[in-house]
Amino acid sequence: MMVIRPVERSDVSALMQLASKTGGGLTSLPANEATLSARIERAIKTWQGELPKSEQGYVFVLEDSETGTVAGICAIEVAVGLNDPWYNYRVGTLVHASKELNVYNALPTLFLSNDHTGSSELCTLFLDPEWRKEGNGYLLSKSRFMFMAAFRDKFNDKVVAEMRGVIDEHGYSPFWQSLGKRFFSMDFSRADFLCGTGQKAFIAELMPKHPIYTHFLSQEAQDVIGQVHPQTAPARAVLEKEGFRYRNYIDIFDGGPTLECDIDRVRAIRKSRLVEVAEGQPAQGDFPACLVANENYHHFRVVLVRTDPATERLILTAAQLDALKCHAGDRVRLVRLCAEEKTA
């Protein structure tokens, strides 16, 4: 059975294996053991209540409960940009016009922005390619909404998610090549690694401070503004079905879109509800896949089950109860996947 649980110190080698499969561009999952160990420690200290809000971040893994295999990772940053500035480009417009010459030009322009400072962030979503089946991607991505719904007071009113931009298999980013490299004088992979390992001072030091007309970029770079890496397209679709939207903010490195949503408008958060759980044999029928989560902050668990999403009393097997760290009579959080999201 596939289960979402909080990360543990012993997961570092599994996270290293996942990091080696990302293909680059996933800044928050670098193949660097010291960085990943520090990330795990920060998550553990967050759960233990030892960090200020500006440093808090939760990390979860997707585990096969039978074999112990870690198949994926996802995370939530509680409030971005309160320690180090959190940069985006806002894609806006500058108008240059002359009535005398009968000239009017509305020019797409990139403005350096810290507009998302303080927002909660969905990040570090990666599922091992071998496990991209049977609804695992939905479970991994949406489990975070179950945690946010259960512990709403831990998070801020706006949630953002940076989507990986267009990068080829050799680490070539058209957006970086045309813009970032001119200011940072390094390859995309180097900048990506520095950022992923926490060495972010260079961003503030070297970032272009003035608006940039996109027409000055290569056509290839212009074409990828706000576009996602092909492997990231499913993750974008999942978030958009939950209510997230692209509001013209992009990543400063690869030009990928930043999606955002008010936390209380996220579908899975808004529609999830608490039901009593009982042990038994679940009813047979053509039921939709539903996320089921416990309400245990320190031992949080989420699984995917097929059941009636309108039920008031959820029947689970002993194995499912064990996976959820629940007992008969406990209350669990339940929400169905979107109707079009198939798990088989």
Curated annotation (Swiss-Prot):
Q: What is the lineage of its organism?
A: Bacteria, Pseudomonadati, Pseudomonadota, Gammaproteobacteria, Enterobacterales
User: What gene name is listed for this protein?
Assistant: astA
Kindly give the InterPro entries that the UniProt entry links to this protein: Acyl_CoA_acyltransferase (IPR016181), Arg_succinylTrfase_AstA/AruG (IPR007041), Arginine_N-succinylTrfase (IPR017650)
Q: What is this protein called?
A: Arginine N-succinyltransferase
State the active site. Answer: H229
**What Gene Ontology terms describe what this protein does at the molecular function level?**
arginine N-succinyltransferase activity
Q: In which pathway does it act?
A: Amino-acid degradation; L-arginine degradation via AST pathway; L-glutamate and succinate from L-arginine: step 1/5
Q: Which PANTHER family match?
A: ARGININE N-SUCCINYLTRANSFERASE, N-SUCCINYLARGININE DIHYDROLASE
Q: Give the superkingdom in one word.
A: Bacteria
E.C. designation(s):
2.3.1.109
Identify the keywords attached in UniProt to this record, alphabetized. Answer: Acyltransferase, Arginine metabolism, Transferase
Q: What does this protein do?
A: Catalyzes the transfer of succinyl-CoA to arginine to produce N(2)-succinylarginine.
- A matching Pfam family: AstA
